[in-house]
Every structure is written in C-alpha cells, then in structure tokens.
Swiss-Prot record:
The gene is ORP4C. This is Oxysterol-binding protein-related protein 4C. Keywords: Lipid transport, Lipid-binding, Transport. Belongs to the OSBP family. May be involved in the transport of sterols. Expressed in flowers. GO terms for molecular function: lipid binding. It comes from Arabidopsis thaliana (Mouse-ear cress). The keyword Ribosomal protein does not apply. It holds the Pfam family Oxysterol_BP. Disulfide bonds: none annotated. SUPFAM superfamilies: Oxysterol-binding protein-like. Gene3D superfamilies: 2.40.160.120, 3.30.70.3490.
Length: 379
C-alpha cells in the first residue's frame, strides 16, 4: 500500500493577514468548549475537534523552527563567528528567528507515542520523536553537517485554563552546542498565551535566558505580551527587549530591542553603535513547503504519514473525513497501548535514551549526528 504523505506550508509572516479576522463561529466554538472547564484546570489531555486543529502535528511545529527559514542560515552563522561575543549575538539572533506567529483558536495535533518527524534543509538535518504521550513529551535532535552544530530539545507543555485566557508553559531543555568552539548554550522557552478577554489573540510572552558557561556570557530577553492598550497604540505588540552581559559581573555589553516579527537591533553599550541583527521579513517570510525526496525511506511513524488523512480533510474542509481519520489515529494509539499493557511491555523510544525524575524529563540522542532525511525543504 502506497504511503499517504501530506505536507503543508509552514506558517509564514505573510500568511498572517489571512488569519487576522477570526470568524465569530470559531470564537463561539472555543467559548462553548470551555464552558464546563474550571479556571486552573490542566488542559494537557483536552480533546479538540478537527475544526480547531492546524494541519500539522506539534512535532512538525518543533521541527519547523529549526529547518524552516528563508534566506540566511542563522544556525550555521552561530559557529562561523570568530569572537565569543559575536557568537552570543548570533545565538540571540537565531533564537529570535525561532519565534513564529501563532493563529488564535487553532492548535496542532497532540503527537502519538513513537511518532517521528525527519526533515533536511541544506546542511541542517532534523529528527524529532514523541517519547511520551501522557504527559506529551517531545524530543528533537538536529545537526548542522557543515558547521558542526548540535541542537537538542526535550520539551513538554502544561496548558492551563485561567478563565480569561489559556496559559501554556513550555518546560524542559533546549541546548545548542557549537562543537568547533567547544561551547554549550542553554536556553529556555517562553510562555504561550491565548487570550479571550478583553481582546482575543495568541502570543508569546515571558523571559528568555541564554547561558554559555564556557565563555561566561549570558543573554536575557523579555517578550512583552499584547496588552489591551497595545491593541490601540501598537507599541508593545510583539516587542522584545533585553541585554547581553558578562555573567560573573552582570556588566551589560549590548542592549537588545525591537519587534520579533519586524526588526531587532543590538546597541553596543560602550560605543553606542547600533546594528540590525534580525529582520523577520528576510527569515520567516516566504517559507517553502517541504517535499518528499525519497518516498521509500519515509517512515510509517512520520508525522506527515500518521496525520496525512486528517490534514487532507482539514485542508479541503472535508470535516467528516478529518473527524473519521482523527478517530482512527487515536484508536490505533489506544489499541497499541492495550497490547503493551497486556504483554507487560513499556514503550522504548527508537532514537533517544530517556530519563525521568519526578516531573522532569531528559533525553540523549542515540546517534551523534542526524542523517539526511527523505523529506527536504526545496532550494
């Protein structure tokens, strides 16, 4: 039987104009879903109808922030810089590029356990795997063949209903290693907020911290969430402010400011020199849909295969097909769980070694590098 692979275009900057006007029926549907949910409730296992799903898995969303970009290869640039301070600036720039626009009222699929996503873009190879379903924990390993860069994510989120908004805290680790320089950059993930009142919207918020123990440099970035007033003034919408500093003395070296969906600058606090370090229009616009380069090598566990029928139903507005296909995916997962329980087997991830301490998860890739994928971003 031929594999059905359904790949969709990553959400680009220019696509936002199509999602700015939220239809009233979607708002009513969202509010009706939450009418029996108490504030403070954990929404981790909350079931959504296909009409409220993006045509992609959460694994694909994680993968896209690494392999989906237009223009300059910002990840490789982190390693190409000669001086430690320049590498930290490049790391800040790359991190900002991973912030992508969000669509209010729509969420990706919750990946099934064992689901994978494997895509390449030039010298960057990305492999993600769902290492747990309850709770939903995702692992991602990416390697840059040319610049010897290693990226590791082990993330899980806890969405909570707060009455006027949904607060999604992303936990876990995000580590980038510049192996040519023997440097490790540790960083966290901002919160995701979906607000209903006083104004509807979905945005990133909170504090981002980047640390490099080897160079003694650090960075802190504050994402200013959309406030009620900013809806009218436009001043704080997607604003980002922060600094690069020496960790030991807290001496500030650069002041970071701008808007992550537009332009971000870095000001040298000693010389006053200002430079543009990031332009969103040159990096997260005009993103290309990945293509299948080798169908035979596409895994049955690939996100685009697992959710292919569901995504096709959503894209074509065939909601009955999408509902049936989603039920099939979920029933297969339940059946797989029943079989494992009956045989006393526990799930073992294929690509990662996993450790769990209480509520904290950690993972290590089983292979030092990620091979080229059968799915690629076209040049």
């Amino acid at each position: 039987m031929k594999k059905h692979v359904m790949l969709v275009k990553p959400f680009s900057l220019e696509d936002e104009k199509d999602s700015e006007n939220t239809p009233p029926n979607l708002i009513q549907r969202i509010l009706s879903l939450f009418k029996n949910v108490r504030p403070g409730s954990d929404l981790t296992n909350f079931q959504l109808p296909p009409q409220m799903n993006l045509a992609r898995s959460q694994l694909q969303c994680y993968g896209e922030i690494v392999y989906s970009f237009d223009g300059h290869d910002l990840l490789g640039e982190c390693s190409r810089r000669d001086k430690p301070i320049e590498r930290m600036k490049a790391m800040v720039t790359w991190y900002i590029s991973t912030l992508r626009p969000l669509i209010f009222g729509l969420a990706p699929y919750n990946p099934v356990i064992g689901e994978t996503h494997h895509v390449s873009n030039g010298h960057i190879n990305v492999l993600a795997e769902q290492i747990s379903h309850h709770p939903p924990v995702s692992a991602l390993h990416a390697t840059h063949e040319k610049e010897n860069v290693d990226v590791l994510l082990c993330q899980y989120f806890t969405p909570k209903f707060r009455g006027a908004y949904v607060d999604v805290e992303v936990k876990g680790k995000r580590v980038v290693k510049l192996l040519n320089h023997k440097e490790t950059y540790e960083m966290n993930q901002p919160k995701l907020l979906m607000t209903f009142l006083p104004a509807m919207g979905a945005h990133w918020a909170g504090k981002i911290v980047i640390k490099c123990p080897e160079t003694g440099l650090g960075a802190e970035l504050q994402l200013l969430s959309d406030s009620f007033l900013s809806r009218f003034t436009g001043n704080n919408k997607r604003a980002i402010k922060g600094k690069i500093f020496e960790s030991s003395s807290r001496k500030q070296l650069y002041e970071i400011s701008g808007h992550w969906d537009r332009t971000v600058t870095a000001k040298n606090t000693k010389t006053g020199q200002l430079e543009v370090i990031y332009k969103a229009s040159e990096n997260i616009a005009k993103l290309k849909t990945p293509i299948v380069e080798n169908l035979q090598e596409v895994s049955e566990s690939e996100s685009a295969v697992v959710w292919g029928e569901v995504s096709e139903g959503i894209v074509t507005n065939n909601w009955e097909k999408a509902r049936e296909a989603k039920r099939d995916v979920e029933e297969k997962q339940r059946e797989s769980l029943r079989k494992r329980k009956a045989s006393g087997q526990s799930w073992i991830p294929k690509h990662f070694s996993v450790a769990r301490t209480g509520k904290d998860w950690d993972c290590v890739p089983l292979q030092p590098t990620v091979p080229r994928a059968p799915i690629v971003v076209p040049l």
